[in-house]
Amino acid sequence: MADKHAFLPPSDADNWLICAGKPALEEQEPESTSEAAAEGSRKHELAARVLFNPRLIKPDELEDEPEVLAYIGAVNERMQAYREAGVKHLHLAVEQKLDISGITGERGAQGTADCIIVAEFSDYVDMDVIDAKFGFVPVDPNTAQIKLYGLAAVLKYQLLHDFRRINLGIFQPKVSDTLSFIEVSSDELYVFGAKVTEAAALSLSLRGDVTALSHLVPGEKQCRFCKVKHRCPALAQSVAAEV
């Protein structure tokens, strides 16, 4: 689900890791939302309610909700696969709040993992961190957002488990009917986290500082959905240089 009121939102981490001045420039813009974002939030909330306790859902609430049903089905299939593999204990957390303040350095910063599955076997423990995307733009699971959630989940459960592997997954029903995963280790996530901490420190230092403009890095990826690209001086300069 979307991250609310964060200066360094996990959902935009792939962009501010490249363009350090982006959060400072975007903070000057009034907050807004789109119809698509509101619809995505509604679908996330409905799916979470079903996964938490399907008996609390009225039958008509799932009418005309094929994407939500597909996501719920994918999570249930994943749980069943673990059962068939001989799991001893299986824990499911939905819409799990994760503390990311120790990673990004932003006080009180949180992210919300749509689904976390902890699978305890006799001699090892695996964890799935799954993010549901209800848009049309294909999303690769090898993103900073899902890695950030993965690291935050490892830190949350580290006193209980030493994970053999962490599976970071995306489910996007408008693109594919299957979960898409990458496999990482805790050590890989710790290395990633160190890079995030360093980059986040720079972005935070630019908050409210006019020198943030000197840290704007235009590019196709980070500018595509940037809400201030219409007034980004670095992008304007880059475009002018290409003419």
Predicted feature descriptions by range:
Residues Q28-E29, D131-F134, Q172-K174:
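Short, histidine-centered active-site or binding-site loop motifs used for metal coordination
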